[in-house]
Amino acid sequence: MIVPSIDISGGRALQLIEGETEALDAGDPRPLLEKFSVVGEVAVIDIDAARGEGDNEGLISELCNRARIRVGGGIRDIDACKRWLDRGASKIIIGTAATPELLRQLPKERVIVALDSRGGKVLSHGWRRTTESGLLERVEELRDQCGGFLVTFVEHEGHMAGTDLTRATEVVAAAGRTPVTIAGGVSTPGELEMLDRIGADAQVGMALYTGELTLGDAIAAVLRSDRADGLWPTVVVDEAGVALGLAYSDATSLNTAIETGRGVYHSRTRGTWVKGETSGATQELLAVDVDCDRDTLRYTVHQHDGFCHTGTRTCWGEDRGVTRLQRRLSGIGLSPPPASNTARLLREPPLLAAKLIEEAGELAAATEPFEIVEEAADLLYFLLVKLTAAGSTLEAVEDILDRRELRVTRRPMNRKPEES
């Protein structure tokens, strides 16, 4: 699979040839992250920190709150590792500082060891110094102590003339069961397919920036189909992961969906089909994922109105639970019925605040299992009203919790002193 890359220097997204010559200035990295993150994790590399020439910590910390990113560049000690993990980096990328002693202190699954190579030797200091370490020997030494490798063939980086597939195959074999991502020169769907077949991901920058490769073509490259028409089943889910229905995609609809940020599919009768174009039940595309067998897509969407042609939320009828309640409360906020208690809470913040405090106290005092569940339901309702009043959602709360789970430094769980 593809891992889009954003290299940052001086607050701007740059593309360099062999890590030195500036070939392209893509400007503000934020729009790039928004575009790239639809297909999964994005690698964000601090070029300045890697070279020891300043850093872009503030900007990259902000990017950690926007998407799942792998952060690399200048991470050389345990304090820097923990700092980035606490800031919400899904993974950290460590270069020549990745010693067994350092790796033992970190959550293995969230550490990628970067091995930048030229002529089979490992480089350091932002690709400017050659070490005596052999690439394959280094992989074998560290493979049981990290969650993955990022191997960059520096002599191919930025040229878009192809990567070293032979050396990539050797790296994957040396890594054993540890995942490998290859960077340097990858620019065609064929290379992505070959790398996927040998069990490696591809980190791609220049080819995406220049338009030589699209995100849609990158995903399509690894997909296969046993259907006569070559279509890929596409499971459509909402932000909560609730299945809305099943559709089909081809390369054209996949590319169009990613480029436009909408739910676009392939209809066997109508060809390329934009969901909601006639019905108004439109979709905002949030994520595209490929399953483990490479034969099914999953689109995560924000669905407006019902997904099914019958008007129901899903093709299996109406959904239920908290997400449905949240949508109902949002509807009341937009068009409040005159006698609605929810509408009253939305227009009287002091009343809502009092009810939240009251229900939280009742939940804290509850002791019996059923009583606890009942009080939790009461509190959850008022919590959802509070979120609705703020124009926010439970999904936003989940995002915060997901990021907090990534922290490796924990604060003590103490009671706040009571006010006198």
What are these regions (language model features)?
Residues 18-36:
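Short catalytic helix/loop segments, enriched in acidic residues and glycine
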Residues 8-22, 82-157:
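Conserved anion-binding
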Residues 31-45, 87, 142-149:
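Catalytic domains of carbohydrate-active enzymes, especially glycoside hydrolases
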Residues 25, 54-60, 128-137, 161-170:
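Charged helix-capping and loop-helix junction motifs
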Residues 107, 128-136, 181, 196-197, ...:
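Flexible "arm" and connector segments at domain edges
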Residues 41-58, 151-160:
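Glycine-rich, proline-tolerant flexible connector loops at the mouths of alpha/beta enzymes
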Residues 58-92, 101-103, 166-202:
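Catalytic cores of alpha/beta
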Residues 2-8, 42-45, 69-73, 92-94, ...:
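Hydrophobic faces of well-ordered beta-strands that scaffold small-molecule active sites
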